[in-house]
Amino acid sequence: MTGGGNITEITYFILLGFSDFPRIIKVLFTIFLVIYITSLAWNLSLIVLIRMDSHLHTPMYFFLSNLSFIDVCYISSTVPKMLSNLLQEQQTITFVGCIIQYFIFSTMGLSESCLMTAMAYDRYAAICNPLLYSSIMSPTLCVWMVLGAYMTGLTASLFQIGALLQLHFCGSNVIRHFFCDMPQLLILSCTDTFFVQVMTAILTMFFGIASALVIMISYGYIGISIMKITSAKGRSKAFNTCASHLTAVSLFYTSGIFVYLSSSSGGSSSFDRFASVFYTVVIPMLNPLIYSLRNKEIKDALKRLQKRKCC
């Protein structure tokens, strides 16, 4: 800590993490390390596969490759530091490191929310307007939608960081979490946080409620279109096209809403921390599995890649 007049500013935070479970620290380290490596391997493999196979150069897989990239950055913003702290007695992070960690985490999380909205629109165009799909989802539009997702997430995060840097931290420096998250930082502030709380609420409404509403409306129209398909095979194919994205969206939003509703208490309970693990660590690992498990095009691309290697 550094002194400045009558105020002692915090220069580092202590991340409580899972230090209240000393008996299972090594087990947790092993589990999180396996999840992290698996997540990186699956997401990066999916990016490479989509890049290498020309049959996957479509809007759907363009969005999916960007989702995998976001998930790699998203999980990497928290897990490496968490793994490092699990092996240390003093689990600390500098003030600057904390701000950078939250900035990356927030940017990627908000960008993912926007990207999932774009992916829902892509599925809407594919199911509801199949004849016009190619003209609607042009390469130019797809690029702008992805850039828009990144820029929106980045801009919103910059606003949050700007507001966060206006606060003073001069009391307790113990964060009862395994990473720097906004609710926990606001609790530690010794200055008024009303403006930051209002801004966070507005951003939550925009990225959470508004995005979820757009996705729900898109899938409402998709559901109506699927019901109009006469053949059972056609309905099944249309449903399978959307099922993976709907599953990923449901997991992302329900877990996120649950974690941030429970964080009103500061995320101090052990249950809150373990619930956050699912939202921040497990979902980035599950996404490539969800999109690939029953995806015939991904399986066919893997077969073509194997044949290419054999030749």
From Swiss-Prot:
Segments on the Extracellular face: 1-26, 77-100, 156-197, 260-272
Segments traversing the membrane: 27-47, 56-76, 101-121, 135-155, 198-218, 239-259, 273-293
Cross-referenced InterPro entries: GPCR_Rhodpsn (IPR000276), GPCR_Rhodpsn_7TM (IPR017452), Olfact_rcpt (IPR000725), Olfactory_GPCR (IPR050516)
One Gene Ontology term of the molecular function aspect: odorant binding
Main location: membrane
Keyword Cell membrane: yes
An annotated GO BP: detection of chemical stimulus involved in sensory perception
Keywords tagged on the record: Cell membrane, Disulfide bond, G-protein coupled receptor, Glycoprotein, Membrane, Olfaction, Receptor, Sensory transduction, Transducer, Transmembrane, Transmembrane helix
Positions annotated as glycosylated: N6
Keyword Transmembrane helix: yes
Cytoplasmic topological intervals: 48-55, 122-134, 219-238, 294-311
GO cellular component: membrane; plasma membrane
Disulfide bonding pattern of the chain: C98-C190
Compartments (UniProt record): Cell membrane
Membrane topology: Multi-pass membrane protein
CDD domains, sorted: 7tmA_OR5A1-like
Function summary: Odorant receptor for musk, which specifically recognizes muscone, musk xylol, and musk ketone. Ligand-binding causes a conformation change that triggers signaling via G(s)-class of G alpha protein GNAL, activating adenylyl cyclase.
Family statement: Belongs to the G-protein coupled receptor 1 family.
Identification of the protein by name: Olfactory receptor 5AN1
Origin species: Homo sapiens (Human)
Record gene name: OR5AN1
